[in-house]
Amino acid sequence: MGINTRELFLNFTIVLITVILMWLLVRSYQY
């Protein structure tokens, strides 16, 4: 159970970082 929760949290963090990076790229591209 702990390992699955840890993997889920890891995946969520990776997705969050990717979304933030993409948002920053789009924002800097627009300006």
Swiss-Prot record:
Cytoplasmic topological domain residue ranges: 1-7
GO biological process terms held by the UniProt record: calcium ion transport; negative regulation of ATPase-coupled calcium transmembrane transporter activity; negative regulation of calcium ion import; negative regulation of calcium ion import into sarcoplasmic reticulum; negative regulation of protein-containing complex disassembly; positive regulation of cold-induced thermogenesis; positive regulation of protein depolymerization; regulation of ATPase-coupled calcium transmembrane transporter activity
GO molecular function terms listed in the Swiss-Prot or TrEMBL record: ATPase binding; enzyme inhibitor activity
Compartment(s) of residence: Sarcoplasmic reticulum membrane; Endoplasmic reticulum membrane
Keywords: Endoplasmic reticulum, Membrane, Sarcoplasmic reticulum, Transmembrane, Transmembrane helix
Transmembrane segments annotated in the record for this chain: 8-26
Membrane topology: Single-pass membrane protein
Pfam families on file: Sarcolipin
GO CC terms of this entry: membrane; sarcoplasmic reticulum; sarcoplasmic reticulum membrane
Highest taxon of source: Eukaryota
Principal localisation: membrane
Topology feature Lumenal, residues: 27-31
Function as written in the Swiss-Prot or TrEMBL entry: Reversibly inhibits the activity of ATP2A1/SERCA1 and ATP2A2/SERCA2 in sarcoplasmic reticulum by decreasing the apparent affinity of the ATPase for Ca(2+). Also inhibits the activity of ATP2A3/SERCA3. Modulates calcium re-uptake during muscle relaxation and plays an important role in calcium homeostasis in muscle. Required for muscle-based, non-shivering thermogenesis.
Family: Belongs to the sarcolipin family.
Subunit structure: Homooligomer. Can also form heterooligomers with other sarcoplasmic/endoplasmic reticulum calcium ATPase (SERCA) regulators ARLN, ERLN, PLN and STRIT1/DWORF. Monomer. Interacts with calcium ATPase ATP2A1/SERCA1. Interacts as a monomer with ATP2A2/SERCA2; the interaction decreases ATP2A2 Ca(2+) affinity. Interacts with VMP1; VMP1 competes with PLN and SLN to prevent them from forming an inhibitory complex with ATP2A2.
Full protein name: Sarcolipin
Species of provenance: Homo sapiens
